UniProtKB/Swiss-Prot annotation:
The keyword Calcium does not apply. Pfam families: Fapy_DNA_glyco, H2TH, zf-FPG_IleRS. A zinc finger (FPG-type) spans 235-269. Involved in base excision repair of DNA damaged by oxidation or by mutagenic agents. Acts as a DNA glycosylase that recognizes and removes damaged bases. Has a preference for oxidized purines, such as 7,8-dihydro-8-oxoguanine (8-oxoG). Has AP (apurinic/apyrimidinic) lyase activity and introduces nicks in the DNA strand. Cleaves the DNA backbone by beta-delta elimination to generate a single-strand break at the site of the removed base with both 3'- and 5'-phosphates. This is Formamidopyrimidine-DNA glycosylase. GO terms for biological process: base-excision repair. The active site is at 2 (schiff-base intermediate with dna), 3 (proton donor), 57 (proton donor), 259 (proton donor). Transmembrane segments: none annotated. One of its GO terms (molecular function) is class I DNA-(apurinic or apyrimidinic site) endonuclease activity. The keyword Signal does not apply. It comes from Vibrio atlanticus (strain LGP32). Keywords: DNA damage, DNA repair, DNA-binding, Glycosidase, Hydrolase, Lyase, Metal-binding, Multifunctional enzyme, Zinc, Zinc-finger. The gene is mutM. DNA binds at residues 90, 109, 150.
Amino acid sequence: MPELPEVEVSRMGISPHLVGETIKTLTFRTPKLRWDIPQELKRLEGQVIRSISRRAKYLLIETDTGTAIVHLGMSGSLRVLDADFPPAKHDHVDLKLTNGKILRYNDPRRFGAWLWSAPDEIHTVLLGSGPEPLTDDFNADYIAEKAEKRKVAVKQFIMDNKVVVGVGNIYANEALFSSRINPLRSASKVTKQEWLLLTKEIKQVLATAIRQGGTTLKDFAQADGKPGYFAQELQVYGKAGEQCPNCAELIQELKIGQRNTFYCSSCQV
């Protein structure tokens, strides 16, 4: 599933080709992805793309008349192609530009979304979201205060979008391992010093993943079709039964909040 780094890599890949260009047409080959595709998106036709930003795992394609909000879901990807490039199976949305290029959205599982937001409106999917993890607003003071009296497992806590957005399963596993914090520990039991380290490691692992083009485990591809290379850097995610890179113990696997969790019971306390 594309997480924050993969979405940011997609934004960086498509932005140079789209920002400042005019939308000619929008083509929908399915009426519904995760949710119905709103026909208001047609209002973007004839509009200049002013910017492409990211909030949490959503991409915001902004024009003067409104914003297309794109979520990649479980298997979505975006590519910039020549307009005459024939659509393939699972190519559900084409945003055609007047310069002869198209932004094509592919999603085999159809669990992503294309949504509409009017100018100066905050869509309901973005309401109540926590701070971005790569900003100064996400820091040890902030998260330690949020964690007070929270008995939920620390891994589940840092994956809560109301606490901080975009810390997905892969990167939560990796950051907790780097911080030597057991993912089962209650959030309220994490010390201030450990929060200092964990917030630093979350920022570090996300920034590194972005630099390496994200993580391709199955479906994700960058805007140019290339895979993300951070999978080669994974320390514990998907490595159950293998030796811990820091000691001789085997990596354990269990589920926390219905998400696969990988950790070293010796290194992480």
